[in-house]
Amino acid sequence: MGTRDSNNRTFSEIVGLIKSWLPWRSEPATVSRDFWMPDQSCRVCYECDCQFTLINRRHHCRHCGRVFCGKCTANSIPFAPSDLRTPREDWERIRVCNYCFRQWEQGDGGPHVSNITELSTSPSETSLLSSKTSTTANSSSFALGSMPGLIGLNQRVHHGSDVSLHGVSSMETSVTKQGKETSRRSSFIATDVEDPSRFALNSIRSDDEYDEYGAYQTDIETSHSPRANEYYGPMEYNGMGIDDVPCKHLGGETADQKSLSGSPLIHQCLESLIREGSEQFQKKSEHDGRDECEASSPADISDDQVVEPVDFENNGLLWVPPEPENEEDERESALFDEEDNEGDASGEWGYLRPSTSFGSGEYRGEDRTTEEHKKAMKNVVDGHFRALLAQLLQVENISVSDEEGKESWLEIITSLSWEAANLLKPDMSKSGGMDPGGYVKVKCLASGFRHDSMVVKGVVCKKNVVNRRMSTKIEKARLLILGGGLEYQRVSNQLSSFDTLLQQEKDHLKMAVAKIHAERPNILLVEKSVSRFAQEYLLAKDISLVLNIKRPLLDRIARCTGAQIIPSVDHLSSQKLGYCENFRVDRYPEEHGSTGQVGKKVVKTLMYFEHCPKPLGFTILLRGANEDELKKVKHVVQYGVFAAYHLALETSFLADEGASPELPLNSPITVALPDKSTSIERSISTVPGFTVSTYEKSPTMLSCAEPQRANSVPVSELLSTTTNLSIQKDIPPIPYGSGWQAREINPSFVFSRHNISLNLPDRVIESRNSDLSGRSVPVDTPADKSNPIVVADETTNNSLHLSGQGFVRKSSQIGTSIMVENQDNGSELTIAQQQNNEKPKETQSQKEEFPPSPSDHQSILVSLSSRSVWKGTVCERSHLFRIKYYGSFDKPLGRFLRDHLFDQSYRCRSCEMPSEAHVHCYTHRQGSLTISVKKLQDYLLPGEKEGKIWMWHRCLRCPRLNGFPPATLRVVMSDAAWGLSFGKFLELSFSNHAAASRVACCGHSLHRDCLRFYGFGNMVACFRYATIDVHSVYLPPSILSFNYENQDWIQRETDEVIERAELLFSEVLNAISQIAEKGFRRRIGELEEVLQKEKAEFEENMQKILHREVNEGQPLVDILELYRIHRQLLFQSYMWDHRLINASTLHKLENSDDTKREENEKPPLAKSQTLPEMNAGTNSLLTGSEVNLNPDGDSTGDTGSLNNVQKEADTNSDLYQEKDDGGEVSPSKTLPDTSYPLENKVDVRRTQSDGQIVMKNLSATLDAAWIGERQTSVEIPTNNKVSLPPSTMSNSSTFPPISEGLMPIDLPEQQNEFKVAYPVSPALPSKNYENSEDSVSWLSVPFLNFYRSINKNFLLSSQKLDTFGEHSPIYISSFREAELQGGPRLLLPVGLNDIVVPVYDDEPTSMIAYALMSPEYQRQTSAEGESLVSYPSELNIPRPVDDTIFDPSRSNGSVDESILSISSSRSTSLLDPLSYTKALHARVSYGEDGTLGKVKYTVTCYYAKRFEALRGICLPSELEYIRSLSRCKKWGAQGGKSNVFFAKTLDDRFIIKQVTKTELESFIKFAPAYFKYLSESISTKSPTCLAKILGIYQVATKQLKSGKETKMDVLIMENLLFGRTVKRLYDLKGSSRARYNPDSSGSNKVLLDQNLIEAMPTSPIFVGNKAKRLLERAVWNDTAFLALGDVMDYSLLVGVDEEKNELVLGIIDFLRQYTWDKHLESWVKFTGILGGPKNEAPTVISPKQYKRRFRKAMTTYFLMVPDQWSPPNVVANNSKSDQPEETSQAGTQAE
């Protein structure tokens, strides 16, 4: 009995061994006893080394066959029986060792996981996904392996009786997975396999592989291996084979110039087609199913057509899919249909099937496609591709033309690239790679001829077999790939004990080789080393061995051959073997040595794995040149394959979308040069093509049925022209601005006709110093000689556009896009001005700050945000991430739609809502792509099980049908479109070029004017594009500009002056009439004559003021001139009143003798009493006919009866001397301040000189005051003079004179106690002349002489002018009434250069302006600085802190002192904080005794000299500052809580804000650091957004009668919003505590932080990349400075200027330091003792904390729109950033 059992057992073991060798049988998980380690050679446990005894028995692991003790084999795992229908609970469990048990638990590397057939959603790998293909393999040398250890998986395997390599069996796998995951879902469908060799050959990858879109699993994952000849079959473009691409482009084959670029070209002024409006979403009952989607209001169409709004919220029918274009697509196709596949040789993908070929409508059916269009389309694609390769060859310095005896590289590369691209079908499963560069490798072989170059359908590597006796040529080879090494180690680096190694090494290696041989491989590929014993065993078994293969190469071989990399021999199964039709090893002597190499020829050994079953790897072998040339060609080939591959995918996608296939389009082709330093002379143009005029398309005349007729020309015309291409050298550029209008060309490859945009990959772009200037590049390619050709340089971004013989270089102007159309044809040239206020001169001086890198053009940087419309919450805040085209983080378009939008099991991690509850928004450049999803309850699209994705669109600009935008017929997305890069899909969507956007069959843009729908089952996704406003950033300019146009306030001042003058002259005329009625006719004629003359003078002067010639930067109407005329009218009123009084008293002298009167009119004048000459250097416009000045300064006007008056003042009696050369006034003698003769209180009587004119009948009061009789006088000898300080009299460039007259001096207040009477001027009649007949002198003295005499004779005492205020008018009273109504105070002495600044009691800036122009202020701020005073004790202001503590670490370097120097000698080095050691302030006091009472004004100017120097840098001139400050108005500023006084200057240039005492003390402390920081920022052009403070003053007024006194400290700050139309205004502190304005209505409402945060989800503020960087740099610099100065609680004021798309911003309120009261406030708010939210940080925190919070908030508030294509043109000094700015944002790249 025992013998029989033993025989039976032996027989069964033999049968089992034979069965294990049969390839058709799945091997069980238990290892055959033949592969168990022998008992006698194993004396200790393999794991714990314990000795085996009678008690401690040996136990073999049923999985690896090694011997262990009982403790080490205590685990068991389930074993799937051969009948996979056996229920799981009936599965047998087998004993395994601890290591195998851990492998089973981990599920990686063991057969339990690796044998699972991975299923793919990719339609490229299964007929389930609408490819309608079923394939069989003729390489059936694989047996279906075992699938042991599958838990939860049901598998059924039917074994056929045919055990041959071509046997047939079937397998049906049904894989299900229960449960639903929160953010990922995996479901599988059933599949049938009719061939045992058609198992999944793709390698298994972890489902947990990271994906930047989130952890999603595919819905359907299957893969099948078709026949090799089917994989390598020709691809067809709607029946147009690509395999027959000719090697030479015949002359009759033309290429269309219409570029269907996917690359974003520079935006034109095309506006939004669908602007996202207010979106209301309500979450309804889950069982209702009528979920509302988002509302969209399409507006702002680029033409005049009005688009009706589309109501997404209420129009559920908008989402209903239209009818299918092809009824056959509606049918649910069988899973495998052999007949359907027989005619489709396009392979696994079913690329470009006839049903989904070019175009829409009639072009999708074979019977509706003409051969002419197919041929023309093929010519377009091939022509542009050849042009691209020709350009790349030129970059590599490789000749494009045929050389003697050699074939052109252009033809060879074109053929190889197309062949490789057509064969390539990447693994589109979730774990597969998309990059075609990872599947096609290029090898260089310096032997043979160029035409020997070929595409190997497999892998070629530089390897050889270990032993020469091993086979090097095997047909139908079976490969086994082993990871690690084949040595006596369990796994790599796991060592065993020495004695165990000695005992078991040979036995183990023999068993391992036996296991390998049992699988019958022909070739063994090992990653690392192999033991010598094993090598001998393998040689004996006739197995070729290859060692030390790098892991990437192993992966490629495994991917192509279908093998799996086995970690150890314990996991062997026949299912893991690979296969290739031909394996061989060849040796090639390299005949063409490298340049400079001599001697022995190198022999290169190459190993071939040819005709692999899967099209997942190819090798292009380049031959026929030396190594150096082949390396250059290699770069071109690598890119050529990438370009050809993407060309096919993008073309198919556009065809599916319904892009119009019209050929005659007028867009130039753009070709980008790689990263090279090229100039205009070295630029090349090799792009073939032609231009056919485009007829105007009328949307109402075109229909979907006839998309071709409006724009087509016969194809025969398209194929009629040819040209040769050559490099253009030394072509003179057309100057910009000479009528040329151009358009910027984007540096991207634009594939003609079908929107293929390809950019150089990183591996291709390498800087090479190749001289392209002298090469001729004839290319036998059709093109019209008048074709506009563009060569764009990626590095410089200078687009060069060649049109015939014309040549234009891209303008450097920011925001101006340039395109020069065909010059020969006279095409219209257009300019799209994208930004209104760009300044070319400022841009040209700026260096490119962020140069683009080549990698930028191989990826797209987008911003993504997601929000739940059901809950109204933001699920995913806007963030940046980069998608590299076809890279590891890219996805096929089909998978993105399936995983992200159509996965009904998806639940958002944030809101737990499904995908249809969300709206996703991608932003890039100037547009946003909004994705909405809707679940249809009553409609189901067919083909869900097959994975069909349907496409259609609705045009928003076509006439409505039943109230809805018309829809196109829906089509099934082709397999090639399914595999399109999602990144390229986004690039297509955001591109704003006419070629890229493509026109639909109705003539409108697909991506701009249409809603694009994608449907799958009952899920529909809608993609819609809308333009967004990308704002640039405008920082406070370093030099303030003044707007001199359209200033209403100056017009009002002008009208007031004219009105006063008219009132004066009319009042005088009326008074003259009254005098005439009383009988005083004697003087009436003379009075009327003088009145007419003075009125004519006034009108002439006003005309000169209003119509003067002005230079750039000067006001059209000088307000200071108006002030002077206003003051002159006041004195003219006084003079006319005296004239009329005098005339009314002459009735007693009616009969006087005329001769006597005439003698009295011409009295002799003493030399000491001569009339001073009028200022010769005046440029006053008020000089009329009475007083005219020649350029030499001599008075040539008529002086009336005073014609004997000397024209030069006597130097012994006058106060001043004038220069002989005219104009400049200088003191006659320089005396120190202590030598003033006024110091001696000596009575000085006015003595009447001989011949002095005596005035009669004047008012006694006025006359007494006039000559000083009522005052204590001192007599000034005629030989004494009053000398002025030289610094006062020097001509300061800070104050350009209006009238360079005599500069009066306002003596300090303490010196005004001396009452001095001066000799009366000859122009002023004296009362001492008693002869009444001489009173006619009032008429004979011209008014201007009288006015100037007043200014000259009362320089030293403003009290003399007060006498005018004491005069009571009799005839002329209008001026007195104006004063009583609160008018300006004009009786104050004039300022420097006779400048008149009126003072208004309710306008503090007028007081400041007057003080700044006073001689006293100039004396105190003179260069010597003796009179500068310090008021620390009086003002209770602490001394400034040491400037050394304020030295923020900034990278801008030290201050350039030459930049800070002021032109004036007084202003030199005033900004240097170290030049003064104490706070220097100037105080000016002045007063007026007017009608309203005596008032004293005191103005204290803090840091007067430093502020003056700062203004010298930041302002065009000091006079502009004075003009602006002369008038102001109270301003109700909003947003602040301090309730302090606010005012604005009437020109809106400056803002006046009251400063509290604490703020003033804080500023005084850190003012030196402020001046230093601001000066450094300006000199180094470092970005800063501090709103410049140009002065801080204390203004005090005191009414002497009432004793009322007011004081106010104010600062003068630039108005950041000057000249702006701001719709929204934000005051941002970075805090959320009490930072919300509930009343946001109104145009001037200031919004706060919470208002901005609330608006961000729906209406965010977008800025460009460069603008964001500029903003951050400025904020970083300023906050660092403010924190060092212990300043906090500042704000960023942001105004949104929608007209210019700019953010006008600046930091304000930075005067407050962190003092003890702020400490206390912070503590109270933090603890919440007095109420308020406790969970929010207080607004008042320490400066360092405030800085960090402020920076973070400002970075978050403004969303950056990435745009990697725009040239960097941030201009720091005028704070302009480019309009969509791009992007290589440092630190924001999310990959």
From Swiss-Prot:
Keywords: ATP-binding, Coiled coil, Endosome, Kinase, Membrane, Metal-binding, Nucleotide-binding, Transferase, Zinc, Zinc-finger. Component of the PI(3,5)P2 regulatory complex at least composed of ATG18, SAC/FIG4, FAB1 and VAC14. Residues 166-186, 279-370, 770-790, 834-859, 1151-1242, 1769-1791 are annotated as: Disordered. It holds the Pfam family Cpn60_TCP1. A zinc finger (FYVE-type) spans 39-105. Zn(2+) 2 binds at C61, C64, C97, C100. Zn(2+) 1 binds at C45, C48, C69, C72. Its EC number is 2.7.1.150. GO terms for biological process: endomembrane system organization; phosphatidylinositol metabolic process; pollen development; stomatal closure; vacuole organization. This is 1-phosphatidylinositol-3-phosphate 5-kinase FAB1B. Disruption phenotype: Leaf-curling phenotype. Root growth inhibition, root gravitropic response, and hyposensitivity to exogenous auxin. Fab1a and fab1b double mutant displays an abnormal vacuolar phenotype late in pollen development leading to inviable pollen. Residues 324-345 have a biased composition (Acidic residues). PANTHER family: 1-PHOSPHATIDYLINOSITOL 3-PHOSPHATE 5-KINASE-RELATED. Residues 1077-1111 form a coiled coil. It catalyses: a 1,2-diacyl-sn-glycero-3-phospho-(1D-myo-inositol-3-phosphate) + ATP = a 1,2-diacyl-sn-glycero-3-phospho-(1D-myo-inositol-3,5-bisphosphate) + ADP + H(+). CDD domains: Fab1_TCP (cd03334), PIPKc_PIKfyve (cd17300). The gene is FAB1B. Residues 1433-1758 form the PIPK domain. It is an enzyme of class 2 (transferase). GO terms for cellular component: endosome; endosome membrane; mitochondrion. Residues 279-293, 838-850, 1151-1164 have a biased composition (Basic and acidic residues). It comes from Arabidopsis thaliana. It is found in: Endosome membrane. InterPro entries: Cpn60/GroEL/TCP-1, GroEL-like_apical_dom_sf, PIKfyve_PIPKc, PInositol-4-P-4/5-kinase_C_sf, PInositol-4-P-4/5-kinase_core, PInositol-4-P-5-kinase_N, Znf_FYVE, Znf_FYVE-rel. GO terms for molecular function: 1-phosphatidylinositol-3-phosphate 5-kinase activity; ATP binding; zinc ion binding. Ubiquitous with highest expression levels in the root hair zone, pollen, and stamens. It is a peripheral membrane protein. Residues 1167-1188, 1196-1206, 1771-1791 have a biased composition (Polar residues).
